[in-house]
Amino acid sequence: MKPSVILYKALPDDLLQRLQEHFTVHQVANLSPQTVEQNAAIFAEAEGLLGSNENVDAALLEKMPKLRATSTISVGYDNFDVDALTARKILLMHTPTVLTETVADTLMALVLSTARRVVEVAERVKAGEWTASIGPDWYGTDVHHKTLGIVGMGRIGMALAQRAHFGFNMPILYNARRHHKEAEERFNARYCNLDTLLQESDFVCLILPLTDETHHLFGAEQFAKMKSSAIFINAGRGPVVDENALIAALQKGEIHAAGLDVFEQEPLSVDSPLLSMANVVAVPHIGSATHETRYGMAACAVDNLIDALQGKVEKNCVNPHVAD
């Protein structure tokens, strides 16, 4: 008999078929307590779990005594209780490499659109305000040769640095847990402490996962240290930033603009002050949202679950020691 798995995110037909070749697949709409209660027998027998954008916590795991592996269609896993999974010897798989280039493209798009005021001036054109040759009130700021500060020099940080260095001749500063020799050799990137990065960068790009240590890492103190002409970009996790402090910094002119793909609460409330600011580009967590990349992530997640339930955890496993 095939192992039973629960799928809580729709898959393309070919990937669903691949999953069904290996498992008995039960599809549910979400992982809410109501869904779990209504499908208690299925959850009790499931050995695998696959999907995204739902919390997997100790309470859910209590309902899934046979669970051996869970696979998320994402690189981030802050909605998983890793300690609870590990304590129960349940493998957690994710998709860290598939989306690197696409998210770096999104970051660069936010850099360009904020600096050149693309969204703002496009809306002005649509509103009929372009009635003569444009003047300084339509101008943006250059990107080329400006200093880019990257907070978090992982795969995505490296891909962003490549674009900025070779495409825009931008000097690169970075802050990370350790020196990154490849970044320094390939992009002439300079390691510095966070205060120095904030003080010297024209663009500050935040690419950090959400952990207890990074929660509200950026607050009023950090924004006050940035140049008043600086542009802040966040495409990591929303709660790494104190959003009220960001709003205040923008309102007071402590920073020039912001490009945001992530927020403390998602979806962003329609009455958020951020949405009334012309110098803010806010997009709905689209970092990896292309047809090609989202398919690749789903395919990777399917393969990850197949591997995990076959005892193969050489790659893409958050807690591989569970398999020892």
Curated annotation (Swiss-Prot):
It catalyses: glycolate + NADP(+) = glyoxylate + NADPH + H(+); (R)-glycerate + NAD(+) = 3-hydroxypyruvate + NADH + H(+); (R)-glycerate + NADP(+) = 3-hydroxypyruvate + NADPH + H(+). It is an enzyme of class 1 (oxidoreductase). The active site is at R237, E266, H285 (proton donor). Gene3D superfamilies: NAD(P)-binding Rossmann-like Domain. One of its GO terms (cellular component) is plasma membrane. Disulfide bonds: none annotated. GO terms for molecular function: glyoxylate reductase (NADPH) activity; hydroxypyruvate reductase (NADH) activity; hydroxypyruvate reductase (NADPH) activity; NAD binding. Signal peptide: none annotated. It is found in: Cytoplasm. InterPro entries: D-isomer_2-hydroxyacid_DH (IPR050223), D-isomer_2_OHA_DH_cat_dom (IPR006139), D-isomer_DH_CS (IPR029753), D-isomer_DH_NAD-bd (IPR006140), Glyo/OHPyrv_Rdtase_B (IPR023756), NAD(P)-bd_dom_sf (IPR036291). Its EC number is 1.1.1.79, 1.1.1.81. It holds the Pfam family 2-Hacid_dh. PROSITE patterns: D_2_HYDROXYACID_DH_2, D_2_HYDROXYACID_DH_3. Belongs to the D-isomer specific 2-hydroxyacid dehydrogenase family. GhrB subfamily. This is Glyoxylate/hydroxypyruvate reductase B. It comes from Escherichia coli O6:H1 (strain CFT073 / ATCC 700928 / UPEC). The lineage of its organism: Bacteria, Pseudomonadati, Pseudomonadota, Gammaproteobacteria, Enterobacterales.
